[in-house]
Amino acid sequence: MVFFPHRHLLGIKGLSHQDITLLLDKADEAVKISRQREKKTSTLRGLTQINLFFEASTRTQSSFELAGKRLGADVMNMSVGNSSVKKGETLIDTAMTLNAMRPDVLVVRHSSAGAAALLAQKVACSVVNAGDGQHEHPTQALLDALTIRRAKGELSGITVAICGDVLHSRVARSNIILLNQMGARVRVVAPATLLPSGIRDMSVEVFNDMKEGLKNADVVMMLRLQRERMSGSFVPSVREYFHYYGLDAEKLKAAKEDALVMHPGPMNRGVEIASEVADGPQSVIESQVEMGVAVRMAVMETLLVSQNQGERV
C-alpha cells in the first residue's frame, strides 16, 4: 500500500504523480459506493468535518457535505453570513474558535489567496482548500482529472484545451499544474486581456484564436467568465465575447470528433458555452458533478485515515 504524506490539501502544487494517482484510484472506489443503493459507510464515523465558506458556493459546499456524510462523518456547515465574521471577527479569530471545537477536518473557501494555508498553520486538524481567491481549487482539478481518466483511460499524452477567463480562474491554475504533472499536453485559449502574466512559463501552449486552440484537442474545458472579479473592462461585450470565444457546435468541430466538453460550473449559457454543446453528446458536465462527490470522499478518507489512525491508505 502507498502512504499519503500530506496532512492538508491546500493545492495541487506540491502533489507528486503518485499522490495524484492515489487520490484518483481511491475516488474510483468512491464512485462505486455512490452508485450503490446503500451509499453511507462508517469509514469516518465519530469524526467531525466543518465546512467554512466565506464565498457562496452551493455546488461545492453541497458536494463536500455529501462526501462527508457518505463516509459517516458528522458534518457542520458554518454560515458566514450569520457568523461572527460579519461582526468584525478576523480569519485567525475564527480559526482559533473552530480549533477549540476540535474538528478533524476544516474545509475552507475564501476570496483571498493563501487563506487555507494560513488556517492550516493555526489549527490542529486537516485543512482542505475549497478555493482561495485566484490561487487554487485542488478538488476541482482532481475531479476533472478523474472525469477525463474514466472517459479516455489515461491522462498522459492527451491534449486539453482550457478556454476562456484564465486570468481570474483558480480552476485553470490547478488544472494546468495537475495535467502537466500527469503528462498531458495543455493549451490555454483566451483573449490577451484574460491571460495572466507569466502564463507561458507554466508549460502551456497559448492561443488567442478558438479554432486554432481547439484543433485536434481531446478535451475542451470551458471556463466561466468571472465578471464579479473584474474591476475593469476585460471584454468589449458579452455578445462579442461569445462570438469569438463561446463554445458552439461550429467551433467544437475543430477538436477531435470524440472530444470531451467540460465546464466547472456554474455555466453562463450563451456567454462561454452554447446550450447545444453543454447539453450535447460530447458533454461530460454532469459526470463532473458526480465525480466531485467521489473525489471529495477520497480526499477526506485519505487525509483523515492518515492523520487519525496513522494507517497506510
UniProtKB/Swiss-Prot annotation:
Keywords of the record: Pyrimidine biosynthesis, Transferase
Binding-site list for carbamoyl phosphate: R59, T60, R109, H137, Q140, G265, P266
Group of enzyme by EC: transferase
GO molecular function, one term: amino acid binding
An individual GO BP term: amino acid metabolic process
EC number: 2.1.3.2
Chain positions recorded as L-aspartate binding sites: K87, R170, R224
Catalyzed reaction equations: carbamoyl phosphate + L-aspartate = N-carbamoyl-L-aspartate + phosphate + H(+)
Protein origin, superkingdom: Bacteria
Protein's UniProt keywords contain Transferase: yes
GO cellular component: cytosol
Pathway recorded for this protein: Pyrimidine metabolism; UMP biosynthesis via de novo pathway; (S)-dihydroorotate from bicarbonate: step 2/3
Family of this protein: Belongs to the aspartate/ornithine carbamoyltransferase superfamily. ATCase family.
Free-text function comment from the UniProt entry: Catalyzes the condensation of carbamoyl phosphate and aspartate to form carbamoyl aspartate and inorganic phosphate, the committed step in the de novo pyrimidine nucleotide biosynthesis pathway.
Subunit note: Heterododecamer (2C3:3R2) of six catalytic PyrB chains organized as two trimers (C3), and six regulatory PyrI chains organized as three dimers (R2).
PANTHER family with a match to the protein in the record: ASPARTATE CARBAMOYLTRANSFERASE, ORNITHINE CARBAMOYLTRANSFERASE, MITOCHONDRIAL
Full protein name: Aspartate carbamoyltransferase catalytic subunit
Originating species: Agrobacterium fabrum (strain C58 / ATCC 33970)
Lineage start: Bacteria, Pseudomonadati, Pseudomonadota, Alphaproteobacteria, Hyphomicrobiales
